[in-house]
Swiss-Prot record:
Similarity field: Belongs to the complex I 20 kDa subunit family.
Primary gene name: ndhK
MF annotations from Gene Ontology: 4 iron, 4 sulfur cluster binding; iron ion binding; NADH dehydrogenase (ubiquinone) activity; quinone binding
This enzyme's EC code(s): 7.1.1.-
Role this protein plays: NDH shuttles electrons from NAD(P)H:plastoquinone, via FMN and iron-sulfur (Fe-S) centers, to quinones in the photosynthetic chain and possibly in a chloroplast respiratory chain. The immediate electron acceptor for the enzyme in this species is believed to be plastoquinone. Couples the redox reaction to proton translocation, and thus conserves the redox energy in a proton gradient.
Membrane topology: Peripheral membrane protein
Compartments, record wording: Plastid, Chloroplast thylakoid membrane
The protein's name in its UniProt record: NAD(P)H-quinone oxidoreductase subunit K, chloroplastic
The entry's keywords: 4Fe-4S, Chloroplast, Iron, Iron-sulfur, Membrane, Metal-binding, NAD, NADP, Plastid, Plastoquinone, Quinone, Thylakoid, Translocase, Transport
GO cellular component: chloroplast thylakoid membrane; respiratory chain complex I
């Protein structure tokens, strides 16, 4: 029986038999074992300092920060994501095992924030790179708001159906060098598909704007150039 879906369950009744399904048992076991990968790029990430402290103590939710994406099933993105950092974020997400979840924390992560107004190098929303499960607005969000987002994610976990999760594998977005994003199935290798990478056209196919100029120069003979210079000398002497 799921403790989040049925919070009024009396656990003190002796000699009781609780019947459940394998799906609910799997969801219940994952509720208190979320291992986050903290991906912070700017000021919103400083709120984790107070969140880890004794006042809020997010360890009581079973959150154990991991430094390796292969050991994490939750990634919290905080701060501005630039085009230069986008491939690293996608690669970290690809290396996380299924099932995996994303919490977008802060206005800069969700929409690009004030840096995306006239910036050509800022990603306007991390959901253009990876699928987001919970959006957490704020500049920056308070630690209480982060705990509320984790609670909402736990409620989402408790309602998941294993058949749906296994039947429809979560599709991932692949970043290419020409800033185009494709929906691809997960490869878990961290390497880019060479078929999606931008291939520069051959030099012979590039139209040259200076080609008529060189054709004109090649058609002018050295004798004509000598005659032109002689005319210029005569005109200067006459003056």
């Amino acid at each position: 029986m799921n403790s989040i879906e049925f919070p009024l369950l009396d656990r003190t009744t002796p000699n009781s038999v609780i019947s459940t399904t394998l799906n609910d048992l799997s969801n219940w076991s994952r509720l208190s074992s979320l291992w986050p990968l903290l991906y912070g790029t700017s000021c919103c990430f400083i709120e984790f300092a107070s969140l880890i402290g004794s006042r809020f103590d997010f360890d009581r939710y079973g959150l154990v920060p991991r430094s390796s994406p292969r050991q994490a099933d939750l990634i919290l993105t905080a701060g501005t994501v630039t085009m230069k950092m986008a491939p690293s974020l996608v690669r970290l997400y690809e290396q996380m095992p299924e099932p995996k979840y994303v919490i977008a924390m802060g206005a800069c992560t969700i929409t690009g924030g004030m840096f995306s107004t006239d910036s050509y190098s800022t990603v306007r929303g991390v959901d253009k790179l990876i699928p987001v499960d919970v959006y957490l607005p704020g500049c920056p969000p308070k630690p209480e708001a982060v705990i509320d987002a984790i609670t909402k994610l736990r409620k989402k976990l408790s309602r998941e159906i294993s058949e749906d999760r296994m039947g429809s594998q979560r599709e991932n977005r692949c970043f290419t060098t020409n800033h185009k994003f494709y929906v691809r199935r997960s490869t878990h290798t961290g390497n880019y598909d060479q078929g999606l990478l931008y291939q520069s056209p051959p030099t012979a196919e590039i139209p040259s704007e200076t080609e008529p100029f060189f054709k004109y120069k090649s058609s002018v003979s050295s004798r004509e150039l000598g005659n032109e210079s002689g005319k210029e000398d005569v005109s200067i002497q006459n003056k």
